[in-house]
Amino acid sequence: METVQLRNPPRRQLKKLDEDSLTKQPEEVFDVLEKLGEGSYGSVYKAIHKETGQIVAIKQVPVESDLQEIIKEISIMQQCDSPHVVKYYGSYFKNTDLWIVMEYCGAGSVSDIIRLRNKTLTEDEIATILQSTLKGLEYLHFMRKIHRDIKAGNILLNTEGHAKLADFGVAGQLTDTMAKRNTVIGTPFWMAPEVIQEIGYNCVADIWSLGITAIEMAEGKPPYADIHPMRAIFMIPTNPPPTFRKPELWSDNFTDFVKQCLVKSPEQRATATQLLQHPFVKSAKGVSILRDLINEAMDVKLKRQESQQREVDQDDEENSEEDEMDSGTMVRAVGDEMGTVRVASTMTDGANTMIEHDDTLPSQLGTMVINTEDEEEEGTMKRRDETMQPAKPSFLEYFEQKEKENQINSFGKSVPGPLKNSSDWKIPQDGDYEFLKSWTVEDLQKRLLALDPMMEQEIEEIRQKYQSKRQPILDAIEAKKRRQQNF
């Protein structure tokens, strides 16, 4: 009788872990259920809080990871209290891992929902998701925080359809003495021009990324997704703002919303508060319109897991029969899965969020047709063998003009043919590439081939420079750890 009373009272909602819970071992407070995937700096697991029965997400981060980034992520989540931002409940140290306990969003990320359903989103669905996302950005920007990695993979949905901002691994805080940041952080295809150019940026950098995300939700991928990320970062600040591949397929309101987000001048770009008043967002429908696509995505995921389960069970039976033929008493172990549902530990297409993945997901999706059936190569989502990597400090000096020209001029001496002594070999100002029209195909190919080794050389120099700054910090952290151990 006593057990029933403990197990069945009305359970309160978990808001924050109390001091008593935080002093216990995490296994005493949570039951870890399964691995969901990879987030920034760590693996993410689904778990249940024993006292309340509430499902949570736990990010387990190796202590040897970048400690400053982990502390930054925790700090930003601790300060946030919004229904449109993933909640933080508390953290633990366990062996060599830091456990960060946060809100669980059962439907996963928007990008995963697109992949699971093999469909892009409708305007109504996009408007509803953008409305919640803008409320989250309005809150963050009011708190003088920049997310810096807005994309469909970092917008999570709970099972009711509410969108929440997640993955603060690269988020930054604006202070009164630092009104604009000058570091290049984010995912290249979503990055604002001013971020790439390192001319300083503020909260509206997130708005550019939101505009790219709107295109991503409509077309299945961001602009420039099919070209090398390092080439994309040249094109984003140089080219006009991107738009839809087929603008005629989209309403004037949606097209104008994206246009307001993708203004190259940050001073003229709309804020989150202003965009919440845009007709496209104001006419957004309730979250109930997202329930069908959420249920459909979750059904696909469940069927895939059941199929995997049947395959594992079948393999177990076949191996068991073989083992019985080998020996009447000894049964060999069949890996470490033992007939359980396999959950992937890898991410696809750089989603970098606390979401569930199947190993077989990319191979089973086939080709995603986007917008129209008569569109050929442009209308399909191509599978990539490599994942989109988040931008790293290797971009930090990539766009400094003098350094570029020095590298180009020195490299040009070894370039064969007409490129060798050509005055056209310098990077043109203001994106003036008209002179290329007079070149032969052979000359253009030589120029293209010359770019890659030059890029690799610059990246290596920047990497070494970054490492020389990073190493003293790592040494200082290690020294402090040793002193703490001595005490």
UniProtKB/Swiss-Prot annotation:
Q: Which positions carry Phosphoserine?
A: S265, S320, S410, S414
Which InterPro entries has this protein been placed in? Kinase-like_dom_sf (IPR011009), Mst1_2_SARAH_domain (IPR024205), p53_tetramer_sf (IPR036674), Prot_kinase_dom (IPR000719), Protein_kinase_ATP_BS (IPR017441), SARAH_dom (IPR011524), STE20/SPS1-PAK (IPR050629)
Q: Which residues form the active site?
A: D149
Record-annotated SARAH domain positions: 433-480
Q: Which GO terms describe its cellular component?
A: cytoplasm; nucleus
Q: Where is this region: Disordered?
A: 303-332
- Entry keywords, A to Z: Acetylation, Apoptosis, ATP-binding, Coiled coil, Cytoplasm, Kinase, Magnesium, Metal-binding, Nucleotide-binding, Nucleus, Phosphoprotein, Serine/threonine-protein kinase, Transferase
Q: Which residues form a coiled coil?
A: 290-310
Q: Which PANTHER family match?
A: STERILE20-LIKE KINASE, ISOFORM B, STERILE20-LIKE KINASE, ISOFORM B-RELATED
Subunit text: Homodimer; mediated via the coiled-coil region. Interacts with NORE1, which inhibits autoactivation. Interacts with and stabilizes SAV1. Interacts with RASSF1. Interacts with FOXO3. Interacts with RASSF2 (via SARAH domain). Interacts with AR, PKB/AKT1, TNNI3 and SIRT1. Interacts with DLG5 (via PDZ domain 3). Interacts with MARK3 and SCRIB in the presence of DLG5.
State the protein's name. Answer: Serine/threonine-protein kinase 4
State which gene encodes it: STK4
